[in-house]
Amino acid sequence: MTKRAIVAVGGFTSDSGKTTLVCELLRGLPGWEAVKMTRGHYRSCGRDPHACCVSPLLGEEPVIRSGREETYEAGKDTGKYWEAGAANVHWAVVTDRQVGQGIELALARVRSPGVLVEGNSFLRHVAADFTLMVARADRLKLKPSARRVLDRVSAFYLSGEGDAALLRETFEAWRGSENLSGPAADAPVYTREDLPRLLARFRRIV
């Protein structure tokens, strides 16, 4: 697989603002591609709109869809990636056991120097060049898939509007109460006003 700059965008919860951030980053990173990872379960329908009713796609092998014809649908996360200017979009539909194979297959299709990957679980299988963990300051709860990859975090990103200093203060109070260890204990915290700095940093890693 050709080496690409991989920026992972994970999230504390399903509605933390991951997709919004991916789209904001795509607008500032012309030529980058995007990957959406969807973990499905047979006969189940999750809160993620993409995960809902994907069970017909699940099989012995991961399903990878690429290109506008296969991945664009208005209102869906992959459609939003296209609207934000992604050079290409890849959608990997996998079971829990197929996450590693699915992300490898999706990344093998990337032709751009950089790619944004939305999701948490794939980080147990692929080393990203930079991992942003998105959280809402008013909802600082960690779902299991996020907690399992905190040791991969490069930085936290606080989504939503509001005073940046207050958002950081709220987050730091939570971080102190959680007694986090490893990279998550002192990883830098970004807010929307820091997007230009993040974009500049990502441009340098390609």
Where are these predicted regions, by residue range?
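Phosphate-binding P-loop
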Residues: 1-6
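Glycine-rich phosphate-binding P-loop
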Residues: 7-25
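Conserved beta-strand elements of the Class I
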Residues: 8, 33-35, 133
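N-terminal phosphate/diphosphate-binding loop that engages ATP/GTP or pyrophosphate donors
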Residues: 20-94
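Short, high-confidence coil segments that cap the C-terminus of an alpha-helix
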Residues: 30-32, 86, 110-115, 128
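Short, well-ordered secondary-structure micro-motifs
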Residues: 45-47, 102, 127, 144
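Phosphate-binding/switch loop-helix module in NTP-utilizing enzymes
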Residues: 88-123
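Conserved catalytic-core segment of NTP-binding enzymes
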Residues: 114, 119-201, 205
